[in-house]
């Protein structure tokens, strides 16, 4: 069997494409006992949404606490963290905890990319951190790169989102001067029966909005569920708006659509 060396002193089948977890495990064979995964690598292991360029990056971020020397190896970006924090374990790998990882991303991300990542830490399913935990981490971080960007991102981030595209929809709507929609507002019909929990909603105007990825179009079962879901909202006298990638990629179109529906439902600009 032909072998490749992803890291010095480590061998793996040459024809295999190593997953991130496999790559991290391979590096652990030669890593120091005091090393742990951090920054982009930790965020990826946690499932935090990142730009494509970082999702595909093969270099690993490995850190140590001060006063240890940061690791130096081909394929590894070494870091030294000034303060000790309790580590997490993911897939039997030592990883920086979520709030510390978020602080570290301030040196890598900015703008909407950082807001989407922050929403990813605060997400509804498998929540990684609370707003209070991120606020505490920020208040106790000094002379760390990106603190100003982190402050700005946390101010625009929201808890309980489901996807980065949903985050972008919310940001586009709010920045256009429209009212900010609620997240995960639970809708009941006139008889008190559960209708649904849309991604975004204007409860005052009975408008429900869902972002639908490509799977909603290509999966017959999901598509049928979407049709029935729309009917439930309509029967409850709610206006149901379905948003797609085309809307997010064309912000003026998204804003015009939401603005039109708001006005139809009684909103005064």
Which residues does each PLM region occupy?
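Surface segments flanking catalytic/ligand-binding clefts of nucleic-acid enzymes
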Residues: 122-269
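Short gly/ser-rich loop at a beta-strand->alpha-helix junction or flexible surface loop bordering the NTP-binding
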Residues: 1-146, 263, 268-269
